[in-house]
Structure formats: C-alpha cells, structure tokens
Amino acid sequence: MTRKPSNHSTKRKKSQRGRAASKRPLIRCVIFDLDDTLYDCLGQRVRPAHRHAAEAMIAAGLKGSLDQVYRARLRAFHADPMLRHIDSEVIRHFGAADPDAVSRAAHDAYFNCPVGKLTLFRGALPLLHFLKKSGVRIFITTFGDVDTQQAKVAALGLTREPAIEKIYYADRAKRVTKESAFRQIQAETGIPADQILVVGDRPMSEIRAAKGLGMHAVRLRRGEFASQRPADAGERADHEIKNISQVRRLSFTFSAAE
C-alpha cells in the first residue's frame, strides 16, 4: 500500500523549491551582442570578407592566386583573430612591389565587404520572444563600421523585430563603446546592474564591460573568438554556453517584476 505524503512533507518541499527559486538572480533586462551571438558571423561574414580582401590584395599587386591568398589569410586570422598583423604576414609571405598599397586595399575590402543575405541562429528569435513575453527589456549592442553594422541588422530582420527596444552601434572611432552603451541602457531603464544580463562572445569586449559594471555575463563560446581565453577574472563570464537557446535554461529568473 502506497503511503501518501503528509501535509508537512508537501509544505517542506514547496518551501525548498521556493528558496531555490529565490536564489536565482532576477533579470529584467538583457543586452545582446550581434556578431557570433545572434547569428553566425564567422561563417556568413568573416570568411566572405577574407575572400573579398584576398581579391583586393591581388588586384593591388600581391603575388599569389586567389585560393592561395585566401587560405593564407585564414591561417593568419586563426593565429591573430584581432587582425593586428594579418595583412603584413600575408604580404611578407607572398611579396608585393608596394606593400602599403596592398595593406590599404586589404583593410578597406575586409571592412567594407558587401552585406548579403544573413540568417539568425535557429534559437535566436524564440529566445527574444520568450524574453519579451516574460516582460524583459531587450537591447542589442554591436561594434564595427556603423553603416556595415546597420546593413547587417537590416539583413537579419532585426530592425522590424518588435521584441527589441533599441540597437546601439559602437564604432571604431570609439565615440560610442560597448561600456558606454551599457551605461546608457542602465541609465535610461533605471534597472540596477545586478538585474541586467549581457550575452556575447568576446571576453575582452562585452564580457569585460558587463563584469566591470556589475552586470551578469553569459558567453556564447563559438565563432570568431571561440578560442580566446579570458585574460583575468574580469573577462570570465558567469556562464558559458554553446547555443543561444540555452540562455533561457540558465539559473536566472526572467521577469519584469521588481
């Protein structure tokens, strides 16, 4: 004969569940990075941009075939994802009559590669809609050439997405940085830092900025900067995930309630 749990036992279990739920940090605002966070930038943008740059380098006088130069750029990129020395390494390998002209051509082509059709990660839209339905305020911050980033956002259909409250563009001239965008979002929403979650892929960028401001940080470890290791505790996210859809299953309470 099965014994029914006592009222005391049932109440104790409910109390334990309540205490467990209360330990989950409340999140009222989520800030997403764009590249390699909401869509596959490495596959859809970075590799085509390197091919575009390889074509420009050859046109400017680099001595090599398109396939050779493209593969050399990818090898150099994996060794130096911050692009500090990639052009000089490729030029040194192949040779050119005017290295400066080739370097300028590569830089301009890489950062101005035409934006074609782009597709969000499969779980991105369902996550945005889940957060919106939960009453969470949603923002996007993205870094790079502003015109190019705006074209990416439009190609992904995010300018028409009602779940997104506002998109901030951090530029290369650093007139707007991700940290300043985070500060502005906090000031405009009035939401405490410990109720804001930042989701991104770069330890030295949005993760460091979020941690420095006392916000929660989740790193999506894939794409262009997947191999980058945190330099210190300030670049170490609270959680690491491999799929954007995993955000909703993390130990947070997503709600508009204070």
Question: What feature does the model see in each segment?
Answer:
Residues 46-55, 83-88, 146, 150:
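An amphipathic alpha-helix signature
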